[in-house]
Amino acid sequence: MRSVINVLGNAENVFKLIENNLRRVISNVIESIVAIVVNEGNCINSDVSVTEERIATGFYIDKDVIITVSHILSNFKDRLCIISLDGDIYKGTVISVDEDNDLMFIGVDVSRRPLKIEDTLISEGAIVFSSGIAQGILRHFITMGIVSGLEVRSIINNREIEGLMLLNMPTIPGMSGAPLLNIDSNVVGMLLSRSFSYNEFSLALPSSRIFLSYLILRKLGKVVHIKLGLKLLQSPNALKKLKLENGLMIMGIANKLLFKNCNISVGDIIIEVNGKKINTLEDFRKAIALSILDNMSIELILFSQKEGLKRCHVDISSAHLY
């Protein structure tokens, strides 16, 4: 009986710890979270009208820059009204849109404390929190869950987005664009949509994608991407057979110039990009994005079963920059 009581007591302590941490996380971030309303009025109380398709949550990533989802925007002429949880309403202006990641960057004249963005990928099984704006009542909704899976693909706003996180976490309409938070109150992702039409599952974009897109925007004045035209696969079993510690297997090559100039073959393993070891698909995406920031060519180190190690230099101009 005493052991049962001890177990129940320990469980109660765990739940209290989770509850206290959740309260702390939300209190740390709540002032930086806002509602984004696409509106035809003038951003005053009597003019702001809300529909599910035209409202999202957003959060500050800089003192005068808010990030949210781009799928609520029909064109760049749309008027954006920002509504804080303490009732302030002010205008927002679209700075740039990253449709590949369903991101929209909004400039505002009202400064608030930005949230800290993690630039590393969170692991499966991690506990995460979020707070977003509930559509219809414009009040914040708090939710908690776990990261159930990585590298999920989904069609959002008629575009396929890859490398998403699958969350076992309920959300409600209006929460698209809400920050996904870790126990340290740092952003590890952004909610994009509910998954499979069930409220219990959600999809989120990794924070590293947000972090790099914003750095590229600050440097170039717009968000651009490099597309090498390679289809890659994470295959631990293949790496084990080849006695390799890390790498991604090439499963398809759409870029004919890359195929011709580098003699890359299906089955080759990309081990490094610009001196950085590649373990995951997100590592690869990050390394390619960093080449834009560093304004440098791309050097791939590959392993071929026939040729062993080989190098491939890719000039950015020979890749698909968009």
State where each predicted segment sits.
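Conserved active-site neighborhood of the chymotrypsin/trypsin-like protease fold
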Residues: 9-13, 41, 53-55, 60-140, ...
